[in-house]
């Protein structure tokens, strides 16, 4: 059993890293296929996207639904536990926008639509 000094450490362990929060954030708007997530998050590699989805699934934050059809179809969605993070992720998103506008950021950050990233 891992031991932590506060709940923030547990949160960071579960949703920390470069992509987990972002993938979760976009799944909060409804189920997505990997190709849809890849379009929304163009800077993530296919391998890293699959790894991130598997880790989020193992943590109980994301569910994977496989359809019995040809070609195979797989959708990912946030679970009830994952949805409990929605207000937190929305607040982090708002704070990021606020920070990007501050003088400390010195024009280093610009919030754009996903299609403008590729």
UniProtKB/Swiss-Prot annotation:
Alphabetical keyword list: DNA-binding, Transcription, Transcription regulation
User: Molecular function (GO) terms listed?
Assistant: DNA binding
The record's SUPFAM superfamilies line, in alphabetical order, gives:
Winged helix' DNA-binding domain (SSF46785)
Annotated HTH hxlR-type domain ranges read: 6-104
Against PROSITE patterns, the record matches this protein to: HTH_HXLR
Pfam families noted in UniProt: HxlR (PF01638)
InterPro entries for this protein: HTH_HxlR, WH-like_DNA-bd_sf, WH_DNA-bd_sf
Question: Which PANTHER family does the entry link to?
Answer: HTH-TYPE TRANSCRIPTIONAL ACTIVATOR HXLR, TRANSCRIPTIONAL REGULATOR, MARR FAMILY
Protein name in the entry: Uncharacterized HTH-type transcriptional regulator YkvN
Report the source organism: Bacillus subtilis (strain 168)
């Amino acid at each position: 059993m891992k031991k932590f000094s506060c709940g923030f450490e547990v949160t960071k362990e579960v949703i920390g890293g470069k992509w987990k929060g972002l993938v979760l954030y976009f799944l909060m708007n409804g189920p997505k296929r990997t190709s849809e997530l890849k379009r929304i998050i163009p800077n993530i590699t296919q391998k890293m996207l699959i790894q991130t989805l598997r880790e989020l699934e193992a943590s109980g934050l994301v569910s994977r639904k496989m359809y019995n059809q040809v070609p195979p179809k797989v959708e990912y969605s946030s679970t009830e536990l994952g949805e409990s993070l929605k207000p937190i992720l929305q607040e982090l998103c708002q704070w990021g926008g606020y920070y990007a506008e501050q003088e400390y950021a010195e024009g280093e950050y610009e919030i754009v639509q996903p299609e403008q990233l590729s």
